[in-house]
């Protein structure tokens, strides 16, 4: 009987592992840009995360990056994100993705300008066609939006595209458009755009080169922090290297 129970337990463990996938990633970037805005005062960042995806479509993950302690005042120089959601193919090649994404900035103090901390909580829904086209809508659940108070209901809409270059193997053109609408502060609304190339190397390495621009103003990016004289929104070319672990 004990042997039978042991066999069943081992079998259950094998099935569970076969139905789930654990992956990790580690990256370097010349400038960490989030929705068009530099999080590192135009300086390099180290990034990495881990994802657990089940065959059912449920997933959970954590992603981290170094950030500027001047942008995120008196913080630990770290952004640590937690997210969870559900993905399902609803038509051939069309996948729906719903979930929650939560941004945390350990020890970052509340900002004098807004009275709100930087931690931000969002719900999202997205549609994608393979890895070629993605449309996503995110909405802030809490009162604060990265240091801007009274911002519950702030939305971010984005469209992303990725197309392989036929004449060069493993090379793809990528493009992104995003629109931020800050609740109760329409003067902070802006668009962000980036486009570039991604080249896949052996051993799950990707190299990217992208050009970033947006329509934001100085006020947009200095409202939520104490940085002055820093063009966190300026046009820039950003180079990145990412390694994926399966």
Task: Please provide the spans of the model-predicted regions.
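Cleavable N-terminal export/targeting peptides
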Residues: 1-21, 246
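Surface-exposed loop and membrane-interface regions of Gram-negative outer-membrane beta-barrel proteins
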Residues: 58-117
């Amino acid at each position: 009987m004990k042997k039978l129970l042991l066999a069943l337990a081992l079998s259950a463990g094998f099935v569970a592992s076969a139905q789930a996938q654990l992956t990790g990633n580690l990256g370097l970037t010349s400038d960490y840009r989030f929705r068009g805005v530099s999080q590192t005062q135009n300086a390099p960042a180290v990034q990495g995360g881990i994802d657990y995806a089940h065959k059912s479509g449920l997933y959970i993950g954590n992603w981290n990056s170094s950030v500027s302690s001047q942008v995120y005042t008196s913080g630990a120089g770290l952004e640590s994100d937690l997210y969870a959601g559900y993905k399902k193919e609803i038509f051939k090649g069309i996948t729906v993705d719903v979930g929650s994404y939560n941004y945390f900035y350990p020890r970052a103090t509340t900002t004098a300008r807004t009275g709100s901390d930087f931690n931000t909580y969002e719900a999202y829904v997205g549609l994608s066609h393979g890895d070629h086209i993605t449309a996503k809508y995110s909405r802030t659940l809490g009162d604060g939006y990265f240091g801007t108070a009274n911002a519950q209901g702030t939305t971010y809409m984005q469209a992303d595209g990725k197309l392989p270059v036929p004449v060069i193997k493993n090379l793809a053109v990528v493009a992104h458009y995003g629109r931020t609408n800050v609740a109760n502060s329409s003067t902070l609304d802006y668009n962000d755009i980036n486009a570039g190339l991604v080249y896949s190397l052996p051993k799950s390495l990707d190299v990217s080169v992208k050009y970033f621009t947006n329509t934001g103003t100085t006020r947009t990016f200095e409202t939520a922090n104490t940085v002055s004289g820093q063009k966190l929104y300026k046009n820039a070319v950003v180079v990145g290297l990412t390694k994926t672990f399966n």
